[in-house]
Amino acid sequence: MSGLVMPEPDAAVLQRRAGIVADLRNIVPGEGVVDTVNAMRVFESDGLTAHRSLPLVVVLPETVDQVSDVLRYCHDNGIRVVPRGAGTSLSGGSMPLADAVLLGMSRFNRILEIDYPNRVAVVQPGVTNLGITKAVEHEGFYYAPDPSSQIACSIGGNVAENAGGVHCLKYGLTANNVLGIEMVLITGEVLRLGGKHLDSEGYDLLGLMTGSEGLLGVVTEITVRILQKPETARAVMVGFPSSEQAGQCVADIIGAGIIPGGMEMMDRPAIRAAEDFVRVGYPLDVEALLIVELDGPPIEVDHLIGAVESIALKNGSTTCILSQSEEQRLAFWAGRKAAFPAVGRISPDYLCMDGTIPRKELPRVLSGMRELSEKYGLRVANVFHAGDGNLHPLILYDANIPGELEAAEDFGADILRLCVKVGGVLTGEHGVGIEKRDLMPEMFNEIDLDQQMRVKCAFDAKHLLNPGKVFPQLRRCAELGRMHVHRGELAFPDLPRF
C-alpha cells in the first residue's frame, strides 16, 4: 500500500470473527450482514482506489436502534468500526480495516420531512446530495452545497467531510447549511444536536461533528437548510492566455466586493479533457478558463455581469461568453462538474488533491505546481473552486508502471506542503482521511494535535471509531495520560510512553 501504515489488526478479533458475525446477525437480521469475500469486495475501497482492504464484516443497519446496538456491541467487545456513506470519499476516509466492522449507512435513505415555512428538510444520512434538491425543486427550493459527486455522494458523508461545491463561495459549506443532527456514540448512546430552532447555548458540538470524518460518532438524521432558487442566474465563461491572469481576475472580482454564486477555474489540460468528454463549447485556445455565475434579481445580475466583464478585460481576457438560456448555463457547469471523469479518459489513474490557499497566492502555487510536474515527470490538470482558493490538482499516472503511484503520492504531498507554505491548509472539503494523515504535522504542532486528540478521546476513549484516519499513527489516548488496561494487560506494552 505504497508505504501507508495502518493500525495492526487485532489478532484476537480476527480469531473471533465467526462468533462476531453470528452476534451481529442477531442484531441486524436478514440481509443486513455481509461476510463473504466476494460480496465484501464492493466495500474494499472508497473514492481513493489506490488503497484497498477487506473489512472484517459489513453491517447494513436500517434503524437507529440497530446502529445503537451494533456500536454498543463493538464498544463492549473492543471491535473497531469504520462508518461508510456512499463510498465517494477521495481521501480514504472510509477505507476498511481487516479487524473492523464496516458500518454502511446506505439503507438510511429516506427524506423524513420537508418544512417549507421553516425552509428545512429532515433527511437520513444515506440520501444523496442531489436527492434533496430533487425533492424540493418543484416548489422552487434547492439545497445549496453541490460537490461534483452530488449525484452519488450522501448527505451523511457530506457532513463527515464538510463538503462544499461550486456554489459554496456564496452559500457556504455543509457546516453553514446543516441545522441539526441525530447521532449515535460508540457507546450506543443517542443524542441530538441543534434542530429547526435557534441553538446558541453551550458548546457548538454540531459544528464539531461537521467535518469530523467519522471519528466521533455515527450520524443517523440530518436537518438541512433549503433555499429558494434565485430569480435569475447567469454564467459568464472567460478565457485567458495564462493561469496567472485568470488568478488575478479572481482576486480582483472578490476585491471589487462581488460575491458570485460560483466561480470556478480550469487550466488547459482540464479544459481540453472536459470539452472532449462533454462537448459544451469550451474554448480550446486558452490557457485558463473561468466560469463565473451571478445570481439574484435580474437588474442586479445585469449590473454584476458588466462589472465582471470589465474586470476580465483589464486582466487580458481573450474570450467572454455569456449564457443566453438556463440550458446553456447548466451546460457551462456540466463540463466543470465532469472534469474528474473526463480526466479519467486520458489517464489510466489519477490522484485528486484538495489544498486551499489565499486567493492572492494562486499564481505562485500554479508556478510551483508546474515545477513539481517537471520534477516528477507526471502531468497535472487543475480545477479550482477559485473564489475560495480551493485547489483540486489532478495528478495523472499509471499504476501499472512501477513507482508511478509512489511518485504521484509524493507529488501530491509536495503540492499540499506548498499550500501550507503560502498560508493555506491541507484540505478544503475532501477531508484528511488516510491521504493527508501523515502531513498533519506540516500544519499542526504537537500541542495542536494533542488537543485535537483529547476531543477524540472524549467521544471515543478506546479509539474504536475509524482508527488510522486523520491523526498520524501512534497518537492515541494513552499518550495523553489516559490509559486503558484490559484484563490486567496494557495495550502495546513495548511502546515508550513516559
Region locations from a protein language model:
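Noncatalytic alpha-helical scaffold of FAD-dependent oxidoreductases
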Residues: 1-498
